[in-house]
Swiss-Prot record:
Name this protein carries in UniProt: Phosphate acyltransferase
Residue segments, region Disordered: 334-376
Main enzyme class: transferase
Any one biological process term the GO annotation gives: phospholipid biosynthetic process
NCBIfam families, per database record: plsX
Job of this protein: Catalyzes the reversible formation of acyl-phosphate (acyl-PO(4)) from acyl-[acyl-carrier-protein] (acyl-ACP). This enzyme utilizes acyl-ACP as fatty acyl donor, but not acyl-CoA.
Gene giving rise to this polypeptide: plsX
Pathway: Lipid metabolism; phospholipid metabolism
MF term (GO), any: phosphate:acyl-[acyl carrier protein] acyltransferase activity
Amino acid sequence: MTVKLTIDCMGGDHGPSVTVPAAVNFVRSHADAHLMLVGIESAIRAQLKKLKAADNPALTVVSASEIVAMDDPVEVALRKKKDSSMRVALNRVKDDEAQACISAGNTGALMAVSRYVLKTLPGIERPAIAFALPNPTGYTTMLDLGANVDCEPQHLLQFAEMGHALVAAVEGKERPSIGLLNIGEEVIKGNDIIKRAGELLRTSTLNFRGNVEGNDIYKGTVDVIVCDGFVGNVALKTSEGLAQMLSDIIKEEFGRSWLTKVMAVLALPVLLRFKKRVDHRQYNGAALLGLRGLVIKSHGSADAYAFEWAIKRGYDAVKNGVLERLARAMEENAGSLEQAKRDAGGPGSASQMASPIAGPVSGQPAEPYSAQSSKA
C-alpha cells in the first residue's frame, strides 16, 4: 500500500529550505511513500532542482498561493487565507487524496484550520497534541502539548480517553495506565479544574492511577499523562532545553584540554549513544488527536533532520491504522464522555460558554477561536 502524505512546505520558521529537503530524504528511504508538497510552486521546485529531485515520481508539487505566517492570528488563517499551503494540504486529507498532513506551521492556526476542515470525532470537543516521550522502559504518551491553553475538566477526561486509545492501538496495551499531571500526588492538591478532572477520571472506566508530578514524566510511572496545553508545552520545551544544555556541557568539558580531548576519543562510542538518546530532534512530530483525519504538528523551528522525523510520525500513524482505531475507541466511549460532560456542567455551563475555543461537538466552530500563535 502506498502511503500518501501532504506536506505544508511553507509552514515553520524556515519553509521550503527545511521541508523540501526533509521530504526528499524521506522518500529516498521509504519506497512506499508518496508526498504531496504543498505551497508556492516556484519556491518548492527551486529546492527540488537544487536537490536533484525535480523528476522524483514519489514527489508531487501542489500549488497554493498563500502562506500562514507564524505570527498570523487564527482569524486570518481561517477566514482570509483560504488558499494557504496549510489549508490546501488539509483539504487533500479531507478529500481522501492523502492519509495524513504534516505541518510546522503556527500551532493555533493549524488547530483551528484542522478542526474547521476535518471536523472532530464524536464526543470530542477539542483536539489535543499528543506525543510519546522516552522513559527507561519504553514511552510515556503525554497530551495536551500546546493546542489548548485553557481546559475544562471534561476536556481532560477526553484527552485521557484519546491517550488510552492511542497507546492501546500503537503499543497493544489492553488497559494503559493514566495519570493526571499535578503539583502533588494527593487528591487535595491542584486547582479546582484539576480536582474536578480527577473526580471524573476516578469514576470513569479508565485505568486511572491518580495524580502524577513533573518528575514522573520520564520515569515511566504511567503510560499516559494528561494535562492542559499550557502546562504540557512548558514541560516539553523545558525538557528539550535541558537535553540541549546537557549535550553542550559534555561537549564543553571534553574540549577543555588535550587530555580531555583524548578521553573524548576513548569515550566516543558512549558519547555518540548518549547524543542520540538526548537529541530532541528525533522526537519531533506530535499528533493532533480527536480529528477525523491525521495531522502531525512539527516544531516551527525544526531543521530538516527533525522535520523528517515528523514525516515519519505521519507515515507510521497511517501504517498502524491509528485514526481508524482511535475513531472506533471514541465511538465506543461516546456515551461515557457525554455523561461526563453533563456531570461537569454540560455545554450550557458558564465556564464552557465563556470559552470561545469550545465550539459544538460536531467540530465546526461557529466563530474562529483564538489560540496562541506559538512555534510549538
